Amino acid sequence: MSELEKAMVALIDVFHQYSGREGDKHKLKKSELKELINNELSHFLEEIKEQEVVDKVMETLDEDGDGECDFQEFMAFVAMVTTACHEFFEHE
């Protein structure tokens, strides 16, 4: 398996490690999203402590307005963070 394919499998696995703990296994609730960000993105993003921050992140990601983050919305978030990191490291 190529490095890109391994990364794709890892993204799917991480999403499903957190989704469905509290309901729909194909979507992240706010608490699941907060836990995922704090556990899996701690080197790129600050720890989320305030509920308002979680609410704002979810509002930004939740394109269909259902109050949860599906895999497509999660991938859009990963792409945004990855792009920001790439731009940051590109200038170093």
UniProtKB/Swiss-Prot annotation:
Ca(2+) 2 binds at residues 62, 64, 66, 68, 73. The keyword Ribonucleoprotein does not apply. PROSITE patterns: EF_HAND_1, EF_HAND_2, S100_CABP. Residues 13-48, 49-84 form the EF-hand domain. It is found in: Cytoplasm; Nucleus; Secreted. Keywords: Acetylation, Calcium, Cell adhesion, Cytoplasm, Metal-binding, Nucleus, Repeat, Secreted, Zinc. Its main location: cytoplasm. Ca(2+) 1 binds at residues 19, 22, 24. The modification N-acetylserine is found at residue 2. Dimer of either two alpha chains, or two beta chains, or one alpha and one beta chain. The S100B dimer binds two molecules of STK38. Interacts with CACYBP in a calcium-dependent manner. Interacts with ATAD3A; this interaction probably occurs in the cytosol prior to ATAD3A mitochondrial targeting. Interacts with S100A6. The S100B dimer interacts with two molecules of CAPZA1. Interacts with AGER. Interacts with PPP5C (via TPR repeats); the interaction is calcium-dependent and modulates PPP5C activity. Interacts with TPPP; this interaction inhibits TPPP dimerization. Small zinc- and- and calcium-binding protein that is highly expressed in astrocytes and constitutes one of the most abundant soluble proteins in brain. Weakly binds calcium but binds zinc very tightly-distinct binding sites with different affinities exist for both ions on each monomer. Physiological concentrations of potassium ion antagonize the binding of both divalent cations, especially affecting high-affinity calcium-binding sites. Acts as a neurotrophic factor that promotes astrocytosis and axonal proliferation. This is Protein S100-B. It comes from Mus musculus (Mouse). The gene is S100b.
